[in-house]
Amino acid sequence: SSGWNRVLAYQYLDFHRQMYEEDVPSPYLIRSYISDKSDYEMIYKSTEAEDSSFFFNVTMQNHSGYAQGWYNLPRHIELPNNLKAADRTAEQFLDLMKESDLALEELIGYYSQCEEPTLVVFFGDHQPPLTNAFYEELYGKKLSERTTQEVLQQYAVPFFIWANYDIEERQDVVISPNFLGVLTAQTAGLPLTGYMEFLAELYEVMPAITPVGFVTADGQYLKKSELSQEQQ
């Protein structure tokens, strides 16, 4: 796909090698997309063949929309009637999440048995495009009535950093994507560039900077209009 100027952006990332759908032999599909399981199997093969490597891996299994049929996707999730009526595609998304969990469990299990030191950084890129009615059922109120904290939490996605060797353990880390590369480098013990050092200092003041709001070091959830002059 060429959306978001990917064709040019991927070149600027300057990876030694790029792999796409056509590079996966006999992939296991879920719906019409390559499954997380097949995706991870390509990584296993690559890391077995190379002494060291860095992957930026984007999976497609759970891409919207969620009314594409159930090919190779077992039905496990049944929502309450009010949520089902608000968005009849939500169950498919949640079943896809279950398949992702199973593949992720396999990924972590695989690298936990490897002698080569391995660091996995896992994060989602955005919330699923379910209907506003679905989210309003979850909140029990109109989306227009959400607090800044609720808006930010709706857009939040899970992430973790895992290693098959000892690293500092942290829980409930608040961070926006612009800082994640810095945290990864710090966790891996890699040197920071000057720009990354700037981001590391900024993170101590404002750990989440997003288009829909900000989180301060003392845990305040603020709109842009609520930022102090110093924060701006």
In which residue ranges do the predicted regions lie?
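Solvent-exposed soluble domains appended to multi-pass membrane proteins
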Residues: S1-Q232
